[in-house]
Curated annotation (Swiss-Prot):
EC number: 2.4.2.10
Entry function: Catalyzes the transfer of a ribosyl phosphate group from 5-phosphoribose 1-diphosphate to orotate, leading to the formation of orotidine monophosphate (OMP).
Lineage of origin: Bacteria, Pseudomonadati, Campylobacterota, Epsilonproteobacteria, Campylobacterales
Keywords: Glycosyltransferase, Magnesium, Pyrimidine biosynthesis, Transferase
Protein name per its UniProtKB record: Orotate phosphoribosyltransferase
Binding site for 5-phospho-alpha-D-ribose 1-diphosphate: 93, 113-121
Source organism of this protein record: Campylobacter jejuni (strain RM1221)
Pathway: Pyrimidine metabolism; UMP biosynthesis via de novo pathway; UMP from orotate: step 1/2
Complexes and interactors: Homodimer.
Domain of life according to the entry: Bacteria
Length: 202
């Protein structure tokens, strides 16, 4: 499966000057919503991701995703794995679990995102699950932006990674994009202004 080509074919592989959710800047952005708007393609991708997770014999009960980006990927992965699905969301900048969702004591979760960059949002969701008595046994995403170690791809962990080193991350592919702090962003130095994805129709 050529994940990069899938993103390009869907118009989801964007080039410009982007402000990422992590606060970093990048010349490239992956707009997974453009990939996941096709239900058949979303099912195909998450069926493949489910096969990878199953092959590692990870035992889990449910899947949780951070809103908003992770919801479609997480729901489709839950469908493919025949598991329960819940999501966390930000309220006043704090990640929370709402909408009547509950976590059972010792319930095992995989945290699923559409894209993992440093893993900050996924880690916030994991901490919510654990604070409610759940157990996080791994992480999953359609793609990794090259910072977190990926179990099935045997890719190394980089300094920016926030996901726990003792838990596996499973993805369909790696996208190796440079990301920058605002202070050393070459695009900023050229006079370009970073755009938050979604703010101008992207």
């Amino acid at each position: 499966m050529n994940l990069e080509q899938i993103y390009k074919d869907c118009g989801a592989y964007l080039e410009g000057h982007f402000l990422l959710s992590s606060g970093k800047h990048s010349q490239f952005y992956l707009q997974s919503a453009k990939v996941l708007e096709d239900p058949k393609l979303a099912a195909k991708l998450c069926d493949e991701l489910a096969k990878i997770i199953t092959s590692y014999k990870i035992e889990f009960d449910s899947i949780c995703s951070p809103a908003l980006g992770g919801i479609l990927a997480g729901y489709e992965l839950a469908r493919a794995c025949s598991k329960r699905f819940i999501f966390t969301e930000r309220v006043n900048k704090e990640m929370t679990l709402r909408r009547g969702f509950e976590v059972k004591k010792s319930e095992k979760f995989i945290i699923c995102e559409d894209i993992i960059t440093t893993g900050g949002s996924a880690l916030e969701s994991a901490k919510i699950i654990e604070s409610l008595g759940g157990i996080v046994v791994g992480f999953a995403a359609l793609a990794n932006r090259g910072f977190c170690a990926v179990e099935n791809l045997k890719s190394p962990r980089k300094d920016n990674a926030k996901l726990p080193e003792n838990l596996p991350l499973f993805t369909l592919g790696n996208f190796e994009f440079e990301i920058y702090d605002e202070t050393n962003c070459p695009l900023c130095k050229k006079g370009s202004k970073a755009i938050k994805p979604g703010s101008r129709g992207n």
